[in-house]
């Protein structure tokens, strides 16, 4: 289960005691979760007004950055196409897997200097992730256009003889070319009707060249045959052929056009290969950047909410729980027993659903302790 609960509780005599109490109740004694300390440095508190406003801003920023993280991860899966099993190993943060990064989280002092105000730090994060989001849109658009154009050409060369491009199938020798009077048509003949074709094609219209039909290709259901006749008999031949379930394809042999199509396909294929490597590298780097930013936002939210709830001086312990999938309900109950004294209005919530005025949270999300979920299930495979 790649879901974490990031919680905080006020320090008792020491923050270490708070941690030991939680660890004993959730991990040591009953294996409800894997627990670890979550290290948040001494950030600048600022004024109460700023903290209240920042609490709302960080909630919005959290949702935005989570969305960007998921978009980058999902686009990585789209780009890797047949290698989706390899996607997870490319989704790293600071070169390690996501679980390791979260459980060993250390604040990045270089990127987000703690001498800056909380608001400034949140603005640095917002600016960086907005840039990633904009870059992703432009890179994805360019790559998707290239991929789409290539797929369109590939589709033309796939499918049945009734619909696919015939340029790759036929040769110059299959046609009478540059004749004032004669023309070669290509006809799709159902295999079940092939004997009828052999018997009838010379008499479907006047002026069909005898013994001019050969099988050029076949698929599961049909043969592709050529036939040569006088140009003025083409319309009549088409009409009679259709009546007998023989389909004349619209095709003119043009070497220049065929060469241009082939060159275009080769160019697109080469361009796609050239762009693939740098794009995957960009996605890896920027997934890491966005994910790191996201976890720093979680740390900011815990800090701000803990100060707002537990007051000053700053005295709380942030802790990370990775719930045992089968014990989620029990874990919630244990946490409730540990911390229900912190907020009398929340004491009944676990048993009795209720709305709390002034809180934009459903009752399932509000607890007497500070709580934020980190869900590392970032991919939705189709």
From Swiss-Prot:
From the Swiss-Prot or TrEMBL record, give the protein name. V-type proton ATPase subunit C 1
Quaternary structure, per UniProt, is: V-ATPase is a heteromultimeric enzyme made up of two complexes: the ATP-hydrolytic V1 complex and the proton translocation V0 complex. The V1 complex consists of three catalytic AB heterodimers that form a heterohexamer, three peripheral stalks each consisting of EG heterodimers, one central rotor including subunits D and F, and the regulatory subunits C and H. The proton translocation complex V0 consists of the proton transport subunit a, a ring of proteolipid subunits c9c'', rotary subunit d, subunits e and f, and the accessory subunits ATP6AP1/Ac45 and ATP6AP2/PRR.
| Major site of localization recorded for this protein | membrane
- Per the record, the domain of life is Eukaryota
GO biological process, alphabetically ordered: synaptic vesicle lumen acidification
- InterPro entries, A to Z: ATPase_V1-cplx_csu, Vac_ATP_synth_c_sf
Q: Which residues carry this modification: N-acetylthreonine?
A: 2
Q: Which GO terms describe its molecular function?
A: proton-transporting ATPase activity, rotational mechanism
Gene3D superfamilies with a match to the protein in the record:
3.30.70.100, subunit c (vma5p) of the yeast v-atpase, domain 2, Vacuolar atp synthase subunit c, domain 1
One cellular component term from this protein's GO annotations in UniProt: apical part of cell
Query: Hey, which family's this protein in?
Result: Belongs to the V-ATPase C subunit family.
